[in-house]
Curated annotation (Swiss-Prot):
Keyword terms, alphabetized: Cytoplasm, Pentose shunt, Schiff base, Transferase
Organismal lineage: Bacteria, Pseudomonadati, Pseudomonadota, Alphaproteobacteria, Hyphomicrobiales
Molecular functions (GO terms): aldehyde-lyase activity; transaldolase activity
Keyword Plastid: no
Protein name: Probable transaldolase
Domain of life: Bacteria
Any one GO biological process: carbohydrate metabolic process
Function: Transaldolase is important for the balance of metabolites in the pentose-phosphate pathway.
Natural source organism: Rhizobium meliloti (strain 1021)
């Protein structure tokens, strides 16, 4: 499974990338607002940190305007992945951009039917939102299962990018089901390493080692 981080905070991205954990980055207008920086400036810096795809989202809702924004975003760096909304215009733009050799991420997916359309449009990634479905008492993982089955049935190459991930259990369940990628906030990715028995065991080993009076180096 690939790990993307869902943030526009350069400090967090650099830290996770230095750990060797990152395969890519996803951003959106809300994260750009939170970062408080110019979209071109911050996206260019992010692209210089990570080698994998960096999703940068168009804000236009009409096809021709989407294509204009996509052209501007694609000039930022070679690893830009154009993020598009799951609308008819977004799918049309996805098809055109993919045919022209660009990576695409079709976002705001909440149904298997929508994911099927994204795959038909040739999307590099489709982003089903787990947490937001959970918020309305719908099991977001059921959507991941349905998409996985459909894509496997027909051999679609579009990668399932599990988004709106809020807990370490979301990451685990997405991995068990077979999502290709998970994108999560920095804190969630860091929390994957935590287990109380790991901390307890390390504490015991260190205490016992101190009693030996030895040094390794």
């Amino acid at each position: 499974m690939k790990f993307f981080v869902d943030t526009a905070d350069v400090k967090d991205i650099r830290e996770l990338n230095d750990l060797g954990l990152l395969d890519g980055v996803t951003t959106n207008p809300s994260l750009i607002l939170k970062a408080g920086r110019d979209i071109v400036e911050v996206t260019k810096e992010i692209c210089s940190i990570v080698e994998g795809p960096v999703s940068a989202e168009v804000t236009a809702t009409e096809y021709s305007a989407m294509m204009k924004e996509a052209a501007a975003l694609s000039k930022i760096a070679d690893n830009i992945c154009i993020k598009l909304p799951l609308t008819l215009d977004g799918l049309k733009a996805c098809k055109a951009l993919t045919s022209d050799g660009h990576q695409t991420n079709v976002t705001l997916c909440f149904s298997a039917n929508q994911a099927l359309l994204a795959a038909k449009a040739g999307a590099t990634f489709v982003s089903p939102f787990i947490g937001r479905l959970d918020d309305i008492a719908v099991d977001g993982m059921d959507l991941i299962r349905e998409i996985r089955q459909i894509f496997d049935n027909y051999g679609y190459e579009t990668e399932i990018l599990a988004a709106s991930v809020r807990t370490v259990n979301h990451v685990k369940e997405a991995a068990l089901i077979g999502a290709d990628v998970v994108t999560a906030p920095p804190a969630t990715l860091k929390a994957l390493v935590k287990h109380p028995l790991t901390d307890k065991g390390l504490e015991m080993f260190l205490a016992d080692w101190a009693k030996t009076g030895q040094k390794i180096a």
